[in-house]
């Protein structure tokens, strides 16, 4: 017979049945991420960093529960059920807290219907809601950025909105991509690459090469959420055009296979060019500086028009024939009424190796884009990937610690494949990256300041 659970019961002593029930509550909507970032060391520092969270996340691909693995690991520190329940209540996961210690959950929460209980803290703190697909009206700046029709509801679908994009049939897109040929484009086929939410194929429309992204449901992404991201991408691109944002040409939504059609970027992604994929030559330092400045221009345009990208990374920075940077993938973008506003979301999204500490807690703020851009600047300097499990340190952003501890210098990490790197400008870009990567969001510069730092670097 199992012993009753008490606040002093060790987490490591929970039986498999209880762990399975906990994972049923905590695994969905990535509640385990919220729990992981809430767990602290005795010193008050975070116990789990981005790399740890990536490892837990990878377990989903093998069919394992990240919640169970997280509790197995944390359980080695002699933490108790009481400790766990305190954190579950803190992050508003009341159902699993009640499962463990019913009396530990506030009576006001338990007495509410389930839907209200899940959102009880909204009356007292920041709103925690599912990502909406609305786009806030935005002022016109130097480049075209028109607000959506205010007479239409925010949650309208793209089929009923005036998007100004061409509507392709899925049959047309099959035709222009050779039936979505899976052979790599580098080998004469059509497949160009794979992203977080779909596969990109090369196509040809009226003698013009285009890129067709066929969206596909990934682990933990439902069909409904994929449709929301599809709608969001179109709405953002319909209202914002800028030389440093990728150009959306059209879409297809007449079948179960949602597709987006973009202008073709001959030089692929910054990630691929930094890794010299397919034997391409390394980017010069001059080109890297140009890419950094172009990306900063694009981020500034988004922020000044009240948009937070939420997934700035080298894979989402595309390069045209002149190596002009084009920010892509706006499916996770979020509209914010005020530039400095921080809101909360119940779903933590983005790429972990680039995510700011507050983003891992579910905060949505422009300063998280700044942090992610800091990682991109490190990639430009070093030519290294943001994360590599076979490297030490595994997270690229951790080189900042080594440099601050005077164990190494930025020269030790500068990409040796560059022949024109200027030590002074490399140091200046690293200084900008270091400021972007400050743990405290309010200590990071805004994007206008980052632009200034990058311009001074090239002066």
From Swiss-Prot:
Disruption phenotype: Mice are strongly altered in their responses to viral and bacterial challenges due to a severe impairment of interleukin-1 and Toll-like receptor signaling pathways. Malt1 and Irak4 double knockout suggests an additional role of Irak4 in B-cell antigen receptor (BCR) mediated signaling pathway, since the double mutant inhibits B-cell proliferation. Transmembrane segments: none annotated. Keywords: Acetylation, ATP-binding, Cytoplasm, Immunity, Innate immunity, Kinase, Magnesium, Nucleotide-binding, Phosphoprotein, Serine/threonine-protein kinase, Transferase. One of its GO terms (molecular function) is interleukin-1 receptor binding. Residues 20-104 form the Death domain. CDD domains: Death_IRAK4, STKc_IRAK4. The modification Phosphoserine is found at residue 346. The modification Phosphothreonine is found at residues 342, 345. It is found in: Cytoplasm. One of its GO terms (cellular component) is extracellular space. InterPro entries: DEATH-like_dom_sf, IRAK4, IRAK4_Death, Kinase-like_dom_sf, LRR_Rcpt-Like_S/T_Kinase, Prot_kinase_dom. Its EC number is 2.7.11.1. Serine/threonine-protein kinase that plays a critical role in initiating innate immune response against foreign pathogens. Involved in Toll-like receptor (TLR) and IL-1R signaling pathways. Is rapidly recruited by MYD88 to the receptor-signaling complex upon TLR activation to form the Myddosome together with IRAK2. Phosphorylates initially IRAK1, thus stimulating the kinase activity and intensive autophosphorylation of IRAK1. Phosphorylates E3 ubiquitin ligases Pellino proteins (PELI1, PELI2 and PELI3) to promote pellino-mediated polyubiquitination of IRAK1. Associates with MYD88 and IRAK2 to form a ternary complex called the Myddosome. Once phosphorylated, IRAK4 dissociates from the receptor complex and then associates with the TNF receptor-associated factor 6 (TRAF6), IRAK1, and PELI1; this intermediate complex is required for subsequent NF-kappa-B activation. Direct binding of SMAD6 to PELI1 prevents complex formation and hence negatively regulates IL1R-TLR signaling and eventually NF-kappa-B-mediated gene expression. Interacts with IL1RL1. Interacts (when phosphorylated) with IRAK1. May interact (when phosphorylated) with IRAK3. This is Interleukin-1 receptor-associated kinase 4. It comes from Mus musculus (Mouse).
